[in-house]
Amino acid sequence: MTHVLDVQNLRVSFPADHRRVYPVDGVSFWLDRGETLALVGESGCGKSLTSLALLQLVPNPGQIEPGSVIRLADTDVLALRGEALRRIRGRRIGMIFQDPMTSLNPVFRVGDQITEGILAHFKISRAEARDRALQLLQEVGIPDPVERLNAYPHQLSGGMRQRVMIAIALAAEPEILVADEPTTALDVTVQAQILEVLDRLRTSRGMAVLLITHDLGIVAGRADRVAVMYAGQIIEEAPTELLFANPSHPYTQGLFASVPRITGPLRRLTPIRGNVPAPSAWPSGCRFRPRCPKAFDKSEQEPPLLPVDTDHRMRCWLAERHG
């Protein structure tokens, strides 16, 4: 079966001190229509850069390395240039960027910003595009949508601005929606509302969703599968229920151990020791080795993704002991 999105061996490099460093290094994943994949990890692990690479939006002087593969069904994204590339941005992959206050243009009304996205991809009149913009605001749950069409971004709350960003991302009816930290800086109630909007839209439109987050709490019940990133690599991947029931990589276990729980016995939180190294200082072998409480001699060799169980893999030599 052809996946709606298939990424293989994605590597993104930047020049540094007369050499190149790889903040995204060999990332592979796929998405099917109607499913949600959560890409989870700490800040600086390469999640957002991975999402930008999907649309060839890696900032200069970065580059996507030869040998990387990004396919939208039967389309080779990395072979596209100019108008052909512009057509897939928004039309086949919609993007919700991290900070709606800086992503929205402060001097244009909300309705105009949504309308421009529609007109860029559909040959319709401005009046028809404005009607569609109104429908989109209704679809993402914005009250008084007619009034909000004429508002400027600073006149809206953080939750409302995030809903506008979702409407813009949906304007061209994409097959895939990439949501990069869609609930950052929102209070818990608004977070839940935004996630419910994304779930409802995924179901009603049959879209695939790539949910990028550092927060394990929003993944449970929202994603079909989870891929955990560390130091530019996917280090564990599994269906969500399986990963939450049996986190196997020491880093993933550390993430769960550092999350407060409201049920069960009272226990002390256990932080992961040390800090994530910079791409220019990644260790040889397993990249988590200097921080890992379970490191052993073989950890000095770089592990591939190894099977733990059916549909469950991790980048750790301990997987051999699971077998």
Where are these regions (language model features)?
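A short, flexible loop at the N-terminus of ABC-type nucleotide-binding domains that lies
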Residues: 1-4, 13-26, 57-64, 81-84, ...
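Short catalytic/signature loops enriched in Gly
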Residues: 3, 143-147, 237-323
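ABC-type ATPase nucleotide-binding domains, specifically the catalytic core motifs of the NBD
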Residues: 14-18, 56-61, 79-85, 112-128, ...
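P-loop NTP-binding/switch modules centered on Walker-like glycine-rich loops
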Residues: 42, 56, 173, 178, ...
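ABC ATPase NBD coupling module
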Residues: 58, 63, 76-94, 120, ...
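Conserved ABC ATPase "signature" region
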Residues: 72-76, 128-147, 256-257
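Conserved ABC ATPase signature
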Residues: 151-156, 160
